[in-house]
């Protein structure tokens, strides 16, 4: 599927000033915004992103949108700008509810607060009639997981895309988050698609997508930028961009569009380049039975036949000594005993010091849920517990965990 192109840089051409509220500007320039979407549809886009990228409850509250009723009315008005374009073109095009990182201007947000924000945001987008939800330009595992968990409550498909540097880390990076760790964790949790956006037209971007494809069980998204730096000048033209999109399709991208600096001419060129050559990527899956676990920083590949875990750690507020000591051992997995929700929260405060994958053991269903919810990665669950197997499987599926 072909996605649309840039929003903010195109709005800027129409008079929007960077630094102001993009959403408030859109609502005062409805005809121009809808016409931009119509242009993307005519250029071949099969999905358009509603102009809700920075429309979180926190951001809109700064402009007097400070009640639930006002918020949902505003989101509905914004989504209608995209929906009106679809109706005007009588097109079979999906409307994607767009969500952004929330830490850019709110660095002190906890994971729990982010989860509340994305839950409310996703609910408003779903009620406004979006077909799909996306959280894009994401910069940390915490944000990605909060957006996915909040979005899945609506029952709509949820896509996640991150922006990456040349080292395969998300940017701006708050916690050395690995793009590959995001893929493994999020697809296990039920993300419907994952990928990259606002990355440059470069060989490294294409190679990164190819590496993701090796471990992807879900569709991959690629929405590269044609500029470096917000509000910068175009560095690549439409023809070069289209050729790059063709290369991304060769690497296995399933959904392709453009980010900053790409206008409808770029999307049209990409459409012609991709669909005229009938590119079809054949997925190949590895026969390996390796278990893949992750924290926010790295992946861990384990053979299910020979996993040795440490004696279960007891949770407390400071686990630094215990976790650091494990680095000099031959254990494959850190076993963590979770007796209560307090244990789950205590370990969450210490997990950044764990350089091995984690296995939670608990006889308490709610405590186990809390531990998996708070853990920023893909964990393992010890099957030797008092929780019924059917319930354990339900918990593992929700949080993307591996039962062992």
What feature does the model see in each segment?
Residues 1-404:
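Domain-level signal for soluble alpha/beta catalytic cores
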């Amino acid at each position: 599927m072909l996605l649309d192109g840039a929003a903010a840089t195109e709005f800027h051409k129409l008079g929007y000033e960077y630094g102001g509220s993009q959403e408030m500007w859109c609502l005062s320039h409805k005809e121009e915004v809808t016409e931009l979407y119509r242009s993307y549809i005519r250029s071949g886009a099969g999905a358009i992103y509603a102009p809700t990228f920075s429309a979180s409850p926190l951001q809109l509250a700064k402009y007097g949108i400070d009640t639930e009723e006002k918020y949902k009315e505003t989101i509905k008005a914004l989504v209608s700008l995209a929906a009106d374009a679809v109706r005007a073109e009588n097109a079979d095009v999906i409307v994607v509810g767009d969500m952004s990182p929330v830490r850019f201007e709110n660095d002190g947000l906890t994971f729990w607060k982010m989860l509340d924000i994305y839950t409310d945001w996703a609910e408003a987008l779903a009620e406004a009639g979006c077909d799909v939800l996306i959280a894009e330009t994401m910069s940390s595992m915490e944000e990605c997981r909060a957006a996915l968990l909040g979005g899945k409550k609506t029952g709509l498909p949820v896509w996640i895309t991150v922006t990456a540097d040349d080292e395969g880390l998300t940017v701006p990076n708050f916690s050395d988050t690995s793009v590959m760790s995001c893929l493994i964790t999020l697809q296990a949790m039920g993300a419907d698609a994952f990928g990259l956006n606002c990355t440059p037209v470069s060989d490294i971007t294409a190679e990164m997508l190819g590496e993701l494809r090796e471990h992807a069980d879900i569709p991959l998204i690629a929405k590269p930028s044609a500029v470096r730096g917000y509000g910068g000048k175009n560095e690549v033209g439409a023809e070069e961009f289209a050729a790059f999109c063709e290369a991304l399709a060769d690497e296995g991208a399933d959904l392709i569009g453009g980010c900053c600096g790409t206008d409808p001419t770029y999307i049209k060129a990409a459409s012609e380049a991709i669909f005229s050559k009938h590119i079809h990527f054949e997925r190949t899956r590895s026969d390996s039975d390796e278990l893949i676990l992750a924290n926010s920083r790295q992946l861990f590949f384990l053979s299910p036949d020979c996993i040795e875990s440490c004696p279960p750690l007891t949770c407390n507020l400071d686990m630094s000594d215990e976790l650091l000591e494990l680095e000099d051992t031959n254990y494959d997995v850190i076993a963590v005993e979770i007796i209560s929700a307090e244990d789950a929260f205590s370990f969450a405060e210490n997990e950044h010091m764990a350089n091995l994958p984690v296995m939670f053991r608990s006889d308490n269903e709610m405590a186990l849920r809390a531990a998996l919810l708070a853990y920023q990665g893909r964990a393992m669950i010890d099957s030797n517990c008092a929780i019924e197997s059917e319930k354990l499987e339900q918990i593992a599926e929700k949080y993307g965990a591996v039962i062992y």
